[in-house]
Amino acid sequence: MRIIKQVMLATLMLLSTHSMADSLKVMAYNIMQLSVQDWDQANRAQRLPAALMSLSDSPDVILVSEVFNSDGEQALAALSTLYPYQTPNVGQDCSGSGWDALTGNCSNSPFVIRGGVVVLSKYPIISQKAHVFNNSLSGSWDYMANKGFAYVEIEKNTQRYHLIGTHLQATHDGNTEQEHEVRMGQLSEIQSFIETENIPVNEPVIIGGDMNVEWSKQHEVADMLATAHAELNFKTPAVGSFSAKDNWFTKANAYYFEYSLDYNDTLDYVFWHRDHKQPINAPSMTVRYPKAQNNWYWSYLRGNWNLSDGRYYHDGYYNELSDHYPVQVNLEF
């Protein structure tokens, strides 16, 4: 009987510890709202708020990327009842308006578009700063965008959290080694920023976004985590965050840009900085699969598709919100 009581007491103490723990749920989501070409931007953007607001296990913070147009910004504004604290769009205004600080290589050229990163929070943002990357690959599409990162310090239940949302250099041709080097340079800029901020070591630092690092290339993942001074728990899912095999909108992207219609990998991450306060729950990153409640028509999808398992006729109706699925980590401290 004494042993049973001791076990029960230990269990109650463990449950009490978890109930008292500070927690933060963080999502990274590339919503693919481009400023050029017809990718059904308006229809997807209109349906995004309802899909995010209906999610179970709702994130406290969303690190959003590829908000390159007004449709995307209007969708985020429609989420203000759930996420009343929102940063400006990184690189949209090189004056630094709306930020506590803006650093880096922000271009005022009329040919350069906004960076597309926005942070949404349920909890007050105490400080918000933006940086436009100095590292960028000349000749790539990314070179014509003020891509960088948004830093926020938020407060939830008296605990301060520091978050960085970003979108690293995309792969635009076969020279992945060169693009990987640029991505690591961009992560080094993030690390330099963290060091300069002198963030207390007893406060968490969380980094997330579309890193454009393929989970299947574990040597590149190792480089990413080492450069970012980061920790990550993630098991390969059946459907990754960027899956042409599962997501018909991603399949359309694969067809247009001529890569495998069966492509299935993860490019998006949320990890925590190893030099700051560590989570106590060994959190795992998961891929989430939000979809619109109802299907709608997009003419690009309609027709016969030659798939690996045979010819398939698509009627043009779909309910995907982006070519990426979001990833989420629930952290306890």
Report residues per predicted region.
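Bacterial N-terminal signal peptides that target proteins for export
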Residues: 1-8
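Active-site-proximal beta-strand elements of phosphoester/diester hydrolases
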Residues: 23-37, 129-134, 160-170, 324
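Active-site environment of divalent metal-dependent phosphoester hydrolases
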Residues: 34, 69-72, 171-172, 212-218
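Structured beta-strand-rich core segments of catalytic domains in phosphoester-bond hydrolases
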Residues: 61, 67-169
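His/acidic metal-ligating clusters that form di-metal
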Residues: 148-166, 179-220
